[in-house]
Amino acid sequence: MTSRFGKTYSRKGGNGSSKFDEVFSNKRTTLSTKWGETTFMAKLGQKRPNFKPDIQEIPKKPKVEEEDTGDPFGFDSDDESLPVSSKNLAQGKGSSYSESSEAAQLEEVTSVFEANSKCSHVVGEDSFASDRCLLVEDTLIGKEKSISRIPEDNANKSSCTKLLTSDKVENFSEEHEKNSHHFHKNAEDSTKKPNAETAVASEYKADETKETNDTWNSQSGKRTESPSESCPVKGSVRTGLYEWDNDFEDIRSEDCILSLDNESLLEMKDEDLKNRIGGLENLNETFEEDIIQSVLRPSNCRTYCRANKARSSQGASNFDKLMDGTSQSLAKANSESSKDGLNQAKKGSASCGTSFRGTVGRTRDYTVLHPSCLSVCNVTIQDTMERSMDEFTASTPADLGEAGRLRKKADIATSKTTTRFRPSNTKSKKDVKLEFFGFEDHDETGGDEGGSGSSNYKIKYFGFDDLSESEDDDDDDCQVERKKDKKRTKTAPSPSQQPPPESSDNSQDSQSSTNNAENLDFTEDLPGVPESVKKPISKQGDKSKENTRKIFSGPKRSPTKAVYNARHWNHPDSEELPGPPIAKPQRVTVRLSSKEPNQKDDGVFKAPAPPLKVIKTVTIPTQPYQEIVTALKCRKEDKELYTVVQHVKHFNDVVEFGENQEFTDDIEYLLSGLKSTQPLNTRCLSVISLATKCAMPSFRMHLRAHGMVAMVFKTLDDSQHHQNLSLCTAALMYILSRDRLNMDLDRASLDLMIRLLELEQDASSAKLLNEKDMNKIKEKIRRLCETVHNKHLDLENITTGHLAMETLLSLTSKRAGDWFKEELRLLGGLDHIVDKVKECVDHLSRDDEDEEKLVASLWGAERCLRVLESVTVHNPENQSYLIAYKDSQLIISSAKALQHCEDLIQQYNRAENSICVADSNPLPYQNVTNHVGKAVEDCMRAIIGVLLNLTNDNEWGSTKTGEQEGLIGTAMNCVLQVPKYLPQEQRFDIRVLGLGLLINLVEYSARNRHCLVNMQTSCSFDSSFSSGEGDHSLRLAGQVHAVQALVQLFLERERAAQLAESKTDELIKDAPTTQHDKSGEWQETSGEIQWVSTEKTDGAEEKQKKEEEDEELDLNKALQHAGKHMEDCIVASYTALLLGCLCQESPINVTTVREYLPEGDFSIMTEMLKKFLSFMNLTCAVGTTGQKSISRVIEYLEHC
């Protein structure tokens, strides 16, 4: 429904502006509309709940073409003439119309019957003539049939009217006569014992009411043909408001169809009814109005009944009974209806004045609703229909009494000026009309009876549904369902006989208990109620204001808590009929008056049982070899409200993001302090702070990852002009160089580093600065450098050049790339390094220098030479540059350093781990890392390494190096004599380096070959051990020819290699065979073969451990033996290569070498060289130039 339908009922004009005022003020049953003079029949419906479920399962029937299109109230047409169905009266308003006297009631009955004579076939089989002269359910059932038969069944109007009149008056007279004590004696005691009286009254006259209804239904004609489409809640729709509801129900189920053609019976009832009308003249006028508005329709229009009213007739009769003046209360009616075994609460709540949708306060015409979609209270209901009748009948409501009914009528008459959107203390005329037609949703009205049990209801205002014009089969369904419901109601226990509820907890379990609270509210408003029951009218106005706010403005504030029906919505009961499933079950909160006599606990709140959260679905495979898939799903409506946050990061991602953000903040802050615009002290402090951060490896990682190193040094490009800033910058570079990974330096950063190296620390520059400030900066840098690896750093001599040199050495040592080698040469870095080497060598030549300075000089020279070695390997440009730099300054310094080291290594002998000098004096330093011998050893290896690179495949380098005085002799000593002063594991290295240097010197230089051949040297220190006693004289002889010493070295190493090979072959031949595993045996058990381990004794375990240890020792010995064999082979190979190089282009040298060889055969040398070449090709240890040289020597020796 759209909001355009709200125009009819939201008029804000003055009193008397509506056509309905004629009905209220003049008490006339005719209404002048644009279709003409029509008889107005209003049926007080129950209050509709504020719930509107979707009706998706109910098929809508197409409209019958022959139906009368002249809708008297225009619910199917335009906005201006949208009529109000009088049957949609609010439950509370219907109950507020109570009979004041028997004469008034008789007059109302007479007027109702007169009006009904103008209406054609408005009543279904289950007529509610006895329930306020017409049950809403019957009119609803007969809706579609009667609509389609309006032009045809005019002849039946008078008969129907007579039947209704006679039936109703007869039943009413009997009810009034038999149960007058129930009608009037409870006027004052309704609040005390309403439930019991209601039960008595409703059981007393149920049969008679049903009989009259059946007669009326039979006269009206069968209208329902398709029971399958009718609503399954028919029987329960009926609520026992009247005392004769039980009799009415008994007769209805039996005589409904049988009396269809029984015209004689109709006539009898008509006559009897007329006779009884004369005896009921004293009935209240309210009863007449109620019957007129809710039962009868004008003669020129169809009956506006809800399509599902077949089961709702009892609910209508509840309200009729409340208005008839009978002492039955609304709660009793609801308990009667719940006896039917159906969801009476749904029907009761269906009459709530407003829908849950936007069309608040709207009522719908009965003619527009599908028969299966309507309830007693003119509200569309769509529910699971699986709740039992006991679900809503926990307690009985209290009886209003005659005084209460009089009070209700007075309230209606005085509160017609209020609109539904304007709450006030007194009801306006418009409010009365809205309440009269069921458009105001009041807590105190009877509509709240369905509040607790109508959580699954869907409310629609009648008059706007396309299902109203459905076929006749829908009415047939309703008829059959009503019959079953009547029987069920007849057999069901009446909850009205239960004691009144003690608190609002009882009202949560049933619909009738909620109606009980509503009836109590009615009683409060009645003018004739005693003071103990009566409440001020202002309280009623306040409740109306609160209810209006709740309906039209959202949740209202109430002194009491909301009351829910705690029963589950999806648990069917045995007596319930299946109904159309509900798409979205909802819960409607029911608010009770805080001043109810029976409500003791105002703060009790019972939440309903939670619905099934998980739905199990089983998918049957459609193809073979597929499995059945079972899934558990939860509907979105059943899930709790939660906020979905997309793209949530993982914990590790969040931590990483936080770290990155912290780094970004720090670096941005520190960079802002490094700018040249900042004061000098600020820049120095920022640099030291950044260096402190860089002491952490993680921060250095961030700097490299984000490329911030170059940016930092670019900002500090002018630091060389400030002594303190340059010192801080050098400290920052040093800290960054501590990382094992390459520091991403660009050309500008390297240039800055080299410029810092060039700074001279003279006194004049030092005086320019405050000495105190410099000391502070140095102290900070010293503490900072203590936290990092500072093996080679002199903490007592922290200068800019020293820090920059250490940085450069740490960067270029083993980690310098090709671009770095080139930039270092182009920017002048190599010059500074060569100068540093010269400086260190000069310190070595001083005799008075103490050992600490000696070690520092040795470490400085060694580190500079390591850098030069790394930048000259496989780089001819750098080699040539260094050879030519300052007339071979590097070669000269290296030669001097090598000679100093030869002298120092003899002084600080480290052979056999004996740390002693020649005079047997203990060394001043026992720490190996600071030992002089270790420093000398490392420095010797660095010097020979640089010379190897400068002389490799370079004749110029070889010549320049060979020209150095004593260099060839020193190299020969490194091969023959120096290894004896070194530890065993270091001898091989120094010997191979010496042999390699000699090979490079003599390979391309004839001068060097000549010098070496004519040189006198000592024999190898270990030649005597291999020669035995017979060669002892050679060792004592002292000096020998260099060629003879080299041939002797070759023969010794070659013999040692052959001996090692023979031992290895024996080890291979004597390898033990695999012994039988004695740890267990295979056994066959139970038809299976299993390995069963034998129990080991302690002795066996110890023996096994000993064997394992022996095997490990043997393996170590084998490895050592193999290593010794390899060393011997390599030394022999290098010696043979050196001898081969001496023999090139020199027949004299060939003859000299042949003399010292066994039998003068070079085959022993060529075989060793071939093995070495194969090994070199296998390991790719050297470049192609070395392999070519070996191949050339082999070829030459083979042709000798």
UniProtKB/Swiss-Prot annotation:
Deubiquitinated by USP37; leading to stabilization. The modification Phosphothreonine is found at T286. Keywords: Acetylation, Cell cycle, Cell division, Chromosome, Coiled coil, Cytoplasm, Mitosis, Nucleus, Phosphoprotein. Residues 54-64, 171-195, 204-213, 540-549, 1061-1081, 1095-1107 have a biased composition (Basic and acidic residues). One of its GO terms (molecular function) is ATP-dependent protein-DNA unloader activity. The modification Phosphoserine is found at S77, S226, S228, S355, S388, S452, S468, S470, S914. Residues 1-23, 45-102, 171-235, 327-354, 466-562, 1061-1111 are annotated as: Disordered. Residues 266-293, 751-791 form a coiled coil. It comes from the Eukaryota. It is found in: Nucleus; Chromosome; Cytoplasm. GO terms for cellular component: chromatin; cytoplasm; cytosol; intercellular bridge; mitotic spindle; nucleoplasm. Residues 635-1179 form the WAPL domain. Highly expressed in large pachytene spermatocytes of testis. Down-regulated by dioxin in testis. A motif (FGF motif 2) lies at residues 437-439. Residues 1-668 are annotated as: Mediates interaction with the cohesin complex. SUPFAM superfamilies: ARM repeat. Gene3D superfamilies: Leucine-rich Repeat Variant (1.25.10.10). Residues 83-102, 327-336, 1082-1094 have a biased composition (Polar residues). A motif (FGF motif 3) lies at residues 462-464. Residues 503-513 have a biased composition (Low complexity). One of its GO terms (biological process) is cell division. Residues 65-81, 466-478 have a biased composition (Acidic residues). Regulator of sister chromatid cohesion in mitosis which negatively regulates cohesin association with chromatin. Involved in both sister chromatid cohesion during interphase and sister-chromatid resolution during early stages of mitosis. Couples DNA replication to sister chromatid cohesion. Cohesion ensures that chromosome partitioning is accurate in both meiotic and mitotic cells and plays an important role in DNA repair. Interacts with the cohesin complex throughout the cell cycle; interacts with both chromatin-bound and soluble pools of the complex. Interacts with RAD21; the interaction is direct. Interacts with PDS5A; the interaction is direct, cohesin-dependent and competitive with CDCA5/SORORIN. Interacts (via FGF motifs) with PDS5B; the interaction is direct. Interacts with a SMC1 protein (SMC1A or SMC1B) and SMC3. Belongs to the WAPL family. This is Wings apart-like protein homolog. It comes from Mus musculus. The gene is Wapl.
